[in-house]
């Protein structure tokens, strides 16, 4: 069953009739905001409300993680974990076709209203495992923006990350790519006094998620080993700064930051933090020691499709 919200198609064929996760009343508030305001008004709303969730879901700066990437109108994109549509809009502007998937009908409705002019956007509501099993279309890109770390929650397998990657791999065209954005559990901000983004506890990732189940981020070396061990040998790392959520600069191995560039570090909009040391000076030390890539707060990883006989 399909619904139309503006020019967007809301596909409910795989929706089970209830949302299994929610941020509560703030989602209802977000729905009202996007129903009654245009994107040009969002920045004024953010400044007026001073609310983390409103900023997180409506800020145009969220799009920076993919605004620069060379997706074209010849390309099709599968967006997994689309949420309230912070990234769906920029994908729809760049690509020829976007299929966005999310488990929540409420969040998908917010997405549809937020991007209601995007006639090339189809939002499929439902568990990705079910959607994946019924999806025959293949895509040039599959995006995992803040999604891969939750694989253990939704895939009940002994090797959930491998299963998730291989499930995604089947939906890529030849020469297709996975585009992943994820926090670095050894990001400098976590040493400097920021709480772990997903669980809100100090040093939780640094200490190996000893009090956490269901979500896990990785260091650069851990992510490289995970990809290599599962046959994904062709990948490239980028380094969003200050992080992937509100990136202002995207660095790469061929263009790394210079001393003095990384000074925009008080970005804890969602929670209080400690200031244990001067992050700018610490970044300078990492840069001089050629260790920035390992202490970047986030990663953006471009992963080439794995050939079926490549393990």
Question: Model regions: which residues?
Answer:
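Conserved SAM-binding loop of SAM-dependent methyltransferases across substrates and taxa
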Residues: 84-95
């Amino acid at each position: 069953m399909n619904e139309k919200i503006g020019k967007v198609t809301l596909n409910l064929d795989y929706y089970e009739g209830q949302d299994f996760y929610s941020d509560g009343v703030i989602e209802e508030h977000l729905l009202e905001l996007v129903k009654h305001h245009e994107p040009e008004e969002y920045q004024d709303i953010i400044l007026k409300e001073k609310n983390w969730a409103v900023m997180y879901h409506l800020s145009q700066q969220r799009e920076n993680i993919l605004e620069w990437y060379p997706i074209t109108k010849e390309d099709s994109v599968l967006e997994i974990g689309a949420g309230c549509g912070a990234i769906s809009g920029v994908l729809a502007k760049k690509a020829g076709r976007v299929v966005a998937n999310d488990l929540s009908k409420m969040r998908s409705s917010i997405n549809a209203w937020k991007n209601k002019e995007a006639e090339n956007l189809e939002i499929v509501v439902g568990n990705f495992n079910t959607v994946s099993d019924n999806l025959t279309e293949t895509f040039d890109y599959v995006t995992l923006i803040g999604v891969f770390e939750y694989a253990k929650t939704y895939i009940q397998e002994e090797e959930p990350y491998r299963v998730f990657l291989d499930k995604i791999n089947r939906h890529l065209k030849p020469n297709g790519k996975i585009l992943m954005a994820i926090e670095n559990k050894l990001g400098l901000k976590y040493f400097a006094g920021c709480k772990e983004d997903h669980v809100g506890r100090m040093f939780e990732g640094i200490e190996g998620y000893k009090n956490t189940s269901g979500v896990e981020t990785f260091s650069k070396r851990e992510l490289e080993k995970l990809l290599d061990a599962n046959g994904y040998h062709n990948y490239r790392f980028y380094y969003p700064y200050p992080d992937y959520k509100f990136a202002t600069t995207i660095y790469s191995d061929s263009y790394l930051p210079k001393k003095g560039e990384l000074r925009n570090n008080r970005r804890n909009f969602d929670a209080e933090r400690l200031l244990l040391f001067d992050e700018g000076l610490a970044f300078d030390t990492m840069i001089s020691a050629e260790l920035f890539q390992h202490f970047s707060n986030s990663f953006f990883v471009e992963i080439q499709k794995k050939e079926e006989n490549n393990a």
